[in-house]
């Protein structure tokens, strides 16, 4: 009895194990199928990637070959440029040793001619604005060197001649420091200023120079150095040629000298030749007040706007008109207004030109008298005559009547629209409503449109 249940239980266990093994085999089989499907998908993607990467690899190889070819060409061009530079002398030869640079000076010589040219061009452009100052400084240093050398030579002379002046003047030569005017910069900048500014500058410059130069020590120097007066007076004032060169050609040298002499009657004539003895010093009060006034006048003259030739002529005419005080005042003013408005077409002139053109086209037509752009066009006959002058076969003008206004407007507008492609900017009803005095602007606008379309058929 006990063996039967054991056998039944063993059979049940074997059946359960069989079912479990079958389930495991099915799961493993499904897993193998999934792995095979995944492998096939991966293989397909790898094959597609290889298929796409093939042209890319070929392109990369071609680019590498092109790069090598370009490098070869670049090397060849470099050698050609170097040989060209050697033939033209723009660069030193590689085998020839360059001279050693000076001690303390860096070697900044460029290797190619283009770099040297660019550096020179940059230097010239950047230094152009400072050329005047450099020139002034160079001239000032040259004058100072000349005066210092002259003073040293006179100071170290073992003996002085009787004609050279008293020994007091010789001993006081190295003591004073001469002022440093810049006549070169003054003459260079004067042509850009008005004539009044030029006069004020020269007047102030001569006044201040005389006030500074004619001190007691300087007077002794000027009186003592009779053997070399040009060296003593040259650094102080510019020459008359330099002053006169800055003025316009309309002012002569004699006129400028007279003007300067008349305004500086109290100051010594420093423009005269240096052999003339200096005049006595004016009072100190006059010298104290006049430079300030002249400086204010100089600032006022320099702030004036630069006038052109036309503006100068206009100002001259206006001044002449004020001076005449009514003589020919109306005629001159009319001429000035006409000259000011010359070349500017006004609305009235355009209307007059268009009206003259309409008169020339409607000359000889009956019932047409063009005097304006209002009542002369009120009956429609002017429109019909203008269109008929360009298209005489379109209609019979002699059959029209000024009393039939609506018919005239309709005929003229229709023919202009059909034959000249001119749109109706005015309606017939509007012309009928406006009566015998239509709006001049409406009529002028439509006539201007007719002119633009009809002139093509002239």
Swiss-Prot record:
The modification Phosphothreonine is found at residues 96, 272. Keywords: Coiled coil, Phosphoprotein. Residues 94-104, 270-283 have a biased composition (Pro residues). InterPro entries: CH_dom, CH_dom_sf, F-actin_Monoox_Mical. Residues 87-111, 123-142, 151-312 are annotated as: Disordered. Residues 225-244, 300-310 have a biased composition (Polar residues). The modification Phosphoserine is found at residues 98, 126, 131, 252, 254, 267, 276, 341. Residues 348-455 form the Calponin-homology (CH) domain. Residues 158-167, 209-220, 245-254 have a biased composition (Low complexity). It comes from the Eukaryota. The keyword Coiled coil applies. Residues 24-88 form a coiled coil. Disulfide bonds: none annotated. Residues 131-142, 290-299 have a biased composition (Basic and acidic residues). It holds the Pfam family CH. PANTHER family: CALPONIN HOMOLOGY DOMAIN-CONTAINING PROTEIN DDB_G0272472-RELATED, SMOOTHELIN-LIKE PROTEIN 2. Belongs to the smoothelin family. This is Smoothelin-like protein 2. It comes from Bos taurus.
């Amino acid at each position: 009895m006990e063996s039967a249940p054991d056998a039944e239980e063993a059979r049940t266990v074997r059946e359960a194990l069989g079912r479990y093994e079958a389930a495991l085999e099915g799961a493993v089989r499904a897993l193998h199928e999934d792995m095979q499907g995944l492998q096939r998908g991966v293989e397909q993607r790898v094959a597609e990637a290889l298929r796409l990467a093939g042209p890319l690899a070929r392109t990369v190889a071609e680019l590498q070959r092109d790069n090598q070819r370009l490098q070869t060409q670049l090397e060849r061009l470099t050698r050609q440029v170097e040989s060209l530079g050697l033939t033209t002398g723009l660069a030193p030869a590689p085998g020839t040793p360059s001279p050693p640079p000076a001690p303390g000076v860096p070697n900044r010589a460029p290797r190619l001619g283009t770099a040297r040219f660019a550096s020179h061009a940059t230097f010239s452009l950047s230094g152009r604005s400072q050329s005047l100052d450099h020139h002034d400084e160079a001239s000032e240093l040259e004058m100072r060197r000349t005066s210092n050398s002259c003073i040293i030579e006179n100071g170290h002379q073992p003996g002085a001649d009787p004609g050279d002046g008293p020994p007091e003047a010789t001993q006081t030569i190295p003591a004073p420091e001469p002022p440093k005017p810049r006549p070169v910069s003054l003459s260079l900048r004067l042509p850009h200023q008005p004539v009044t500014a030029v006069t004020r500058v020269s007047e102030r410059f001569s006044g201040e120079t005389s006030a500074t130069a004619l001190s007691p020590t300087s007077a002794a120097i000027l009186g003592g150095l009779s053997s070399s007066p040009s060296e003593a007076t040259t650094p102080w004032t510019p020459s008359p040629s330099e002053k006169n060169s800055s003025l316009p050609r309309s002012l002569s040298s004699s006129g400028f000298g007279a003007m300067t002499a008349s305004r500086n009657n109290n100051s010594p004539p420093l423009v005269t030749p240096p052999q003339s003895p200096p005049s006595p010093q004016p009072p100190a009060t006059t010298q104290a007040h006049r430079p300030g006034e002249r400086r204010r006048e100089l600032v006022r003259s320099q702030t004036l706007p630069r006038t052109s030739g036309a503006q100068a002529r206009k100002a001259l005419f206006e001044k002449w008109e004020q001076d005449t005080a009514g003589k020919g005042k109306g005629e001159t003013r009319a001429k000035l207004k006409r000259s000011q408005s010359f070349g500017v077409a006004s609305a009235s002139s355009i209307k007059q030109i268009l009206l003259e053109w309409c008169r020339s086209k409607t000359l000889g037509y009956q019932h047409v008298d063009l005097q304006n752009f209002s009542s002369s066009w009120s009956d429609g006959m002017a429109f019909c005559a203008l269109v008929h002058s360009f298209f005489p076969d379109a209609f019979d003008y002699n059959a029209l009547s000024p009393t039939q206004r609506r018919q005239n407007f309709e005929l003229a507008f229709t023919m202009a629209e059909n034959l000249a492609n001119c749109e109706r900017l005015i309606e017939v009803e509007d012309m009928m409503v406006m009566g015998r005095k239509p709006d001049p602007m409406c009529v002028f606008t439509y006539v201007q449109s007719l002119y633009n379309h009809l002139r093509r058929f002239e």
